[in-house]
UniProtKB/Swiss-Prot annotation:
A ubiquinone binds at residue 201. Keywords: Electron transport, Heme, Iron, Membrane, Metal-binding, Mitochondrion, Mitochondrion inner membrane, Respiratory chain, Transmembrane, Transmembrane helix, Transport, Ubiquinone. Pfam families: Cytochrom_B_C (PF00032), Cytochrome_B (PF00033). It is a multi-pass membrane protein. GO terms for molecular function: metal ion binding; ubiquinol-cytochrome-c reductase activity. The chain crosses the membrane at residues 33-53, 77-98, 113-133, 178-198, 226-246, 288-308, 320-340, 347-367. Binds 2 heme b groups non-covalently. This is Cytochrome b. The gene is MT-CYB. Its main location: mitochondrion. It comes from the Eukaryota.
């Protein structure tokens, strides 16, 4: 009799995906972030579900329902801060996961990569709508500013904004639909994650060398289950430290003031993980141009596979490309810093230069460096 995990229709799928899956023997800790993202998603869905049991999506009571969760619900404060800081961990893991994909050339798995980009957009949309729900000052004004960007679309813009708002301003209808969509999207994301994994398992994982590893594969369990558990423990330690010692470290103090349409905060800014894109948006004086740049700042990832001019897949043995990659990382950190600063000299010019450099590195310098490396290696 064959083992039930290899014969049962349902267990067989799980077995082929997480137990007997052949994995390259050389994959490093940079390959841990996929499983960490799965854990982040599960944590967000569970904490979100319990928060939704106590939350009321109504402009009059939303802010006070969140206060009620923190003060009166058993361990409600843990749920709320796990959910808020869990989103930050989610984005840290996402950025590292995408960075790993760029560095090691994993983007050559085009289906997996493109679904990953769609997932990134979906997670960003979910996080944005979630930020609106506590109905604090930054929630309200963030929603107003970001949804207003749709009005830059020629001809249909204004109609589209009013359609999203459900009225002539961000109000009760907006909050209700944002709550409904914020609840729904993580389940759609979960389904897309399965498709992401389906395409990944069609090709098998990449590895740090970028060389096909079919000749040297090991089973996922126990080797990588143990390795993933180590990553998981480290991530949970970081998350719990944040939740229990500095829960408001990454939040905005303005969001502890109930939303007031008559009083604009001095600096409207999104959560830290959107600041790089927000800086790119602000660096262009034209509204439509800014919106286009904002979308392109993420969509540019879809062009990376088309601009792969190197004869090697990974950057492991490509020092020029490595320098540009780390310059890109430094540039993104600069943009994140600028996004949180007021719109005044010298921050405006720094933001504009960093935005130009961001697109220049990805679209021009990296392909040119790859061609140069090919010539240096006489390929």
């Amino acid at each position: 009799m064959t083992n039930i995990r290899k014969s049962h229709p349902l267990f067989k799928i799980i077995n082929d995906s997480f137990i007997d899956l052949p994995a390259p023997s050389s994959i490093s800790s940079w390959w841990n972030f996929g499983s960490l993202l799965g854990v982040c998603l599960a944590v967000q869905i569970l904490t979100g579900l319990f928060l939704a049991m106590h939350y009321t999506p109504d402009t009059a009571t939303a802010f006070y329902s969140v206060t009620h969760i923190c003060r009166d619900v058993n361990y409600g404060w843990v749920l709320r801060y796990l959910h808020a800081n869990g989103a930050s961990m989610f984005f840290i893991c996402l950025f590292l996961h995408v960075g790993r994909g760029i560095y090691y050339g994993s983007y050559t798995f085009s289906e997996t990569w493109n679904i990953g980009i769609i997932l990134l957009f979906a997670v960003m949309a979910t996080a944005f709508m979630g930020y609106v729900l506590p109905w604090g000052q930054m929630s309200f004004w963030g929603a107003t500013v970001i949804t207003n960007l749709l009005s830059a679309i020629p001809y249909v813009g204004t109609t589209l904004v009013e359609w999203v708002w459900g009225g002539f301003s961000v109000d009760k209808a907006t909050l209700t639909r944002f709550f409904a969509l914020h609840f729904l999207l993580p389940f759609i994301i979960s389904a897309m994650v399965m498709v992401h994994l389906l395409f990944l398992h069609e090709t098998g994982s990449n590895n740090p060398t970028g060389i096909p590893s079919d000749v040297d594969m090991i089973p996922f369990h126990p080797y990588y289950t143990i390795k993933d558990i180590l990553g998981l423990v480290l991530m949970l330690m970081a998350l719990l430290s944040l939740v229990l010692f500095a829960p408001d470290l990454l939040g905005d103090p303005d969001n502890y003031t109930p939303a007031n349409p008559l009083n604009t905060p001095p600096h409207i800014k999104p959560e830290w993980y959107f600041l790089f894109a927000y800086a790119i948006l602000r660096s262009i004086p034209n509204k439509l141009g800014g919106v286009v740049a904002l979308v392109l700042s993420i969509l540019v990832l879809a062009v990376i596979p088309l601009l792969h001019t190197s004869k090697q897949r990974s950057m492991t043995f490509r020092p020029l490309s490595q320098c540009l990659f780390w310059l890109l990382v430094a540039d993104l950190l600069t943009l994140t810093w600028i996004g949180g600063q007021p719109v005044e000299h010298p921050f405006i010019i720094i933001g504009q230069l960093a935005s130009i450099l961001y697109f220049l590195i990805i679209l021009v310098l990296m392909p040119l460096a790859s061609i140069a490396e090919n010539h240096l290696l006489k390929w």
